Design a protein with these regions (language model features):
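Internal active-site segments that recognize and position negatively charged phosphoryl groups
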Residues: 108-124
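Alpha-helical transmembrane segments and their lipid-water interface positions
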Residues: 25, 29-33, 73-74, 115, ...
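Juxtamembrane helix-loop-helix connectors linking adjacent transmembrane helices
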Residues: 72-110
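Interfacial helix-start motif at the membrane-water boundary
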Residues: 52-70
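Hydrophobic alpha-helical transmembrane segments of multi-pass membrane proteins
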Residues: 12-16, 64, 101, 105-106, ...
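Core segments of transmembrane alpha-helices
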Residues: 65-73, 77, 81-82, 150-166
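Membrane-helix interface/capping segments
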Residues: 39-47, 77-88, 123-124
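Cytosolic/stromal cytosol-facing helical appendages immediately following the last transmembrane segment
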Residues: 1-26, 34-53, 125-264
Length: 264
């Protein structure tokens, strides 16, 4: 097969699979939470109002448009792999057994650090205008479809993290797959509009640095705070945490019968 045909085939597969993953995971979450168990889960809804069809159409449109970035970076990563530039390894015992598992939280921390600082800049000029970050903030009452619903200019910046990590950090395909599943799932949960996390989540020593759906909802409501994605570590460190976050969260989580241990 000629090289150009190979890359054309790969590009088509990347765009198709990225689009299907987005539609299946977001639609699946929406179908279960917003439809199938709508009445049972209504007490966990952050904003009692339902997302409008217009808002969800807006999110899906930009969510699919952003897949052009997955196509571009997917082709770049394929080219890097084809030319031996990726740090992938395929034998699990090439590194200590614990490395393949420990690197996952390390990657999550690094990814969140990159996201926090790039996201913070997107709320400042000229980066806000250049990345068209206003597209993502076109909806306040978010839904699962908000995940990855950004202008391609913003998506280009957000996804730049991936090829850099794949070149610099040795990763096994299993580790990489788990990392991608976790990040996508957390993105959907964070934009879901429902708060299922237990009471005490924002103050427990085990989870206080984690993000939540309430955390990100407040960012959409007030764009000057809560810039983290998976974590709120940098927001706590840099003083950009919404001062009402913990109280807001507990008010939404009061219906959850589970409570995490918290400091006295």
């Amino acid at each position: 097969m000629p090289v150009w045909q190979e890359y054309l085939l790969v590009s088509g597969l990347i765009f198709l699979l990225a689009s299907l993953r987005y539609l299946v995971m977001t639609s699946g979450y929406y179908a279960v939470v917003y439809r199938l168990f709508e009445e049972r889960f209504s007490k966990f809804k952050i904003n009692p109002e339902k997302p409008t069809a217009k808002d969800m159409a807006h999110e899906i449109k930009w969510g699919l448009a952003n897949k052009l970035n997955f196509l571009f970076y997917g082709l770049l990563i394929y080219w890097l792999y084809d030319h031996g530039h990726l740090a992938l390894y395929f034998e699990w015992d090439a590194y200590p057994w614990w490395y393949g598992w420990l690197i996952i939280p390390v990657l999550l921390f690094l990814h969140d650090a990159y996201f926090f600082w790039s996201h913070y800049l997107m709320h400042k000029e000229p980066f806000r205008r250049l990345t068209r970050h206003n597209v993502h903030h076109g909806v306040v009452n978010v839904s699962p479809f908000s995940a990855f619903s950004v202008h391609p200019a913003e998506g280009f910046v957000e996804l730049a993290f991936r090829p850099v990590i794949l070149v610099l950090v040795p990763l096994h395909p299993l580790t990489l797959g788990i990392f991608l599943i976790i990040t996508f799932s957390l993105n959907v949960i964070g934009h879901s509009g429902y708060e299922f996390f237990p009471r005490g989540y924002t103050t427990s020593v085990f989870t206080k640095f984690g993000s939540s759906a309430s955390f990100h909802y407040l960012h959409h409501k007030n764009g000057s705070t809560n810039f983290g994605l998976f974590l709120c570590f940098w927001d706590r460190m840099m003083g950009t945490m919404n001062p009402d976050y913990e109280e807001f969260f507990e008010a939404r989580a009061k219906h959850n019968k589970f409570k995490l241990p918290t400091p006295d």
